[in-house]
Amino acid sequence: MNKFTFYLLLMFIACSSYSADYYSDFYSKFHNSMKKFTKPSNMFVDDFRNPKEVNLPWENALVRIPIGETNIYKTTIKNINDKKFPKQKYKTIIYLHGCAGIWKGTVKRMDFFAENGFAVIAPASMAREKYARSCNTDTNQGGLYRSVLKIRQIDAENAILNAKKLGWVDDKNIFLVGLSEGGITTATYNPKNSWLGVSGRIIEGWTCNAGWDEYRGVNSPYNEPILSIVAKYDPWFQADYLKGHCGQFLNKNGFSKSIIIDEDPILSKQHGVLHDPKIKKIAIDFLNSIIK
């Protein structure tokens, strides 16, 4: 092995190690483990749309913007520097985190989409000052605060509205993608007008079946393409009233489809599935097929 080849090998190992360390050491204060939650009895409907509260998830949203074919600009909305990336219109994903907040799986998904040419904005709902715990990830228990869905829908709407005001966002190609509680929000998001709509949606880790009416089904008033992906034996959804898949509720758009993972002995029992290469390809192929 010559010195040049050896040097390249060292560089590759260093970059790989850095990438692994970045995810393993990733920290966010907008996570269940760090958040000081509000008691449900102290949560009031007026707080949901309080301008200060609504602005916090947007200001603290994580941002990923692709630069060329290999680099990603990583920042937040409040710290973004337009001089750090090329001036162009980016097809953009609004990414909605799960009930535990922002974690390494959030940034892994954001980076994956950015590597495939999409800008990604992930509003941090737990940046709100008043926010009640909605799940316990240690016990796979959800539904601890029913009204969280309304808050998440408000945050999604606000992110879409503000994203369309950004000069670098292609407002004809904005997509909504979410995992778990973020997937529930993605499925049930019901924009009041087409300006607040999106060009497509990806629902990960949700069955669209629930005991609460507002959690059940899919809202798609503008018949946009929807991809849903769920593991048949997802440990979060083994109660009878949660079993099923979003394909039972999808619209008639020709690009809409439901993927149920039932044959893979490992993946079929997982909650998040977008780490799997086959599922990644399905997601990217879907997005690329509906770009306007």
Where are the regions a protein language model picked out?
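Sec-dependent signal peptide recognition
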Residues: 2-8
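Hydrophobic h-region of N-terminal signal peptides that target proteins for export
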Residues: 10-17
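An N-terminal hydrophobic leader/cap segment in hydrolases
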Residues: 18-82
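Serine-hydrolase catalytic machinery in alpha/beta-hydrolase-like enzymes
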Residues: 56-169
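Loop/turn elements at helix/coil->beta-strand transitions in domains of secreted/extracellular proteins
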Residues: 89-92, 116-119, 170-173, 196-200, ...
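Primarily recognizes the serine-hydrolase "nucleophile elbow" in alpha/beta-hydrolase
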Residues: 159-221
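The feature captures the conserved acid-bearing segment of alpha/beta-hydrolase catalytic domains
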Residues: 200-265
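C-terminal catalytic histidine-bearing segment of alpha/beta-hydrolase fold enzymes
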Residues: 254-292
